[in-house]
């Protein structure tokens, strides 16, 4: 916890949000592998945010994690029922500072995407399926929502890691209990996951280089 506090409170980087642009308030050199955490709309509790940061650092000690301010998502991301995860990723792409390597958007708002799932042996396409998170693979942005997690902080932290690893090029994993398993439209696999398989971690480390 002490290391996390120093990461989040040290005045290495000061951020402010103006319109659709994030400005750095310091001219200091931005460290390599800097990840910017942005709270979208209401964000999440500070405890959940801290635990997610700790979990990222446990798995990727070289990461420099910087906590940004709160950002209100534009109405273009909202479909009247949920916020579209793909639209959020496009928005994060637009506001991402060039000086950071990744942006993780964190929200308590409900998010969705178009999903094709197997239901009773048949493929079913759902145009507005509620999800836990979405990340570009590979890419520089991802988003995670705790709306469907029932306050489960461990599931939230694991989902943040899961989507972040997608940005590093890691695909879904078939190994049992790996955090990178496909949720298949349910949060069960994420809740029951216990670790990152060594093959997934190796691919992720290559993505950090």
What are these regions (language model features)?
Residues 46-159, 171:
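Metzincin-family zinc-dependent endopeptidase catalytic domain
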């Amino acid at each position: 916890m002490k290391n996390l506090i120093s990461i989040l409170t040290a005045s290495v980087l000061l951020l402010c949000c103006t319109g659709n642009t994030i400005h750095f308030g310091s001219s200091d050199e931005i460290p390599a592998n800097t990840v910017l955490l942005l709270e979208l709309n209401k964000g999440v509790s500070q405890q959940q945010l801290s635990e997610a940061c700790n979990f990222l650092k446990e798995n990727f000690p070289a990461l420099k994690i910087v906590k940004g301010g709160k950002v209100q998502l534009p109405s273009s991301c909202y479909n009247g029922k949920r916020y579209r995860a793909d639209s959020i990723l496009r928005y994060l792409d637009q506001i991402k500072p060039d000086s950071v390597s990744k942006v993780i958007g964190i929200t308590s708002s409900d998010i969705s995407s178009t999903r094709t799932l197997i239901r009773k042996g048949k493929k079913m396409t759902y145009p507005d399926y509620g999800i836990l998170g979405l990340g570009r693979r590979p890419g520089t942005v991802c988003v995670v929502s705790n709306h469907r997690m029932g306050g489960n902080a461990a599931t939230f932290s694991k989902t943040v890691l899961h989507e972040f690893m997608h940005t590093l090029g890691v695909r879904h994993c078939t190994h049992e209990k790996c955090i990178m398993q496909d949720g298949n439209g349910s949060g069960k696999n994420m809740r029951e996951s216990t670790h990152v398989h060594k093959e997934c971690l190796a691919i992720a480390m290559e993505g950090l280089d």
